């Protein structure tokens, strides 16, 4: 009996019937940076063995289904804008004055040459709807193991999502291919208070199959429930707005 108790204390606990709790945790993580609506200023730093580049962006969100991100610098990329409405996504390139709709097959493609995908940027994939969830917990963290449902088209065979319990904050996501090989990691860093909410102020995306590559998004400012964000902020007309 004593030996059994020691084993239970030393190893994480797989919580039976915990899918609803896992869904609630994932939903809370996905709402961290959004709220009902939000405005955000971000810097994205892309590093490769050959070069490094930095982009500054302004973004707005409305609920889970609306998002727009506009590059404000450097000058050569200024005005490039990405719009997401429901499951549709468009990019606007002001230099050629052209709107290009992103097909579903390209959602896992790189956004602006970074290690983040189009899907990462606009969060089109709904984890709680498209993945089966298994919750493992210990005294300090939740580990949620996500595997795609039978009818889900996914680049990932599995996602391990590690979340700190107190305060409830994301720590890391590990992405595996269909063969069980870990191919990238998303690490959350440097928690700060924005609009009264504590959340990570930086996210590092590390592609493990591309040595020397790293993309970091820094959140410079976040405002929740800002005035002026409405349905019309996410129109195709707004997408083509020049700055």
Predicted segments — roles?
Residues 4-15:
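Sec-dependent N-terminal signal peptides
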Residues 18-37, 43, 53, 86-157, ...:
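Flexible, processing/modification-adjacent segments and terminal tails
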Residues 29, 57-61, 188-193:
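Extended lipid/amphipathic-ligand handling interfaces
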Residues 40, 67-71, 89-93, 99-101, ...:
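Short hydrophobic/aromatic-rich beta-strand segments that constitute the beta-sheet cores
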Residues 40-76, 168:
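N-terminal, post-signal-peptide region of Sec/Tat-exported proteins
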Residues 45, 62-64, 72-74, 87-88, ...:
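Solvent-exposed coil/turn segments that connect beta secondary-structure elements
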Residues 61-62, 83-85, 92, 135-138, ...:
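Generic beta-strand structural signal
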Residues 122, 141-234:
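Gly/Pro-enriched, hydrophobic low-complexity segments
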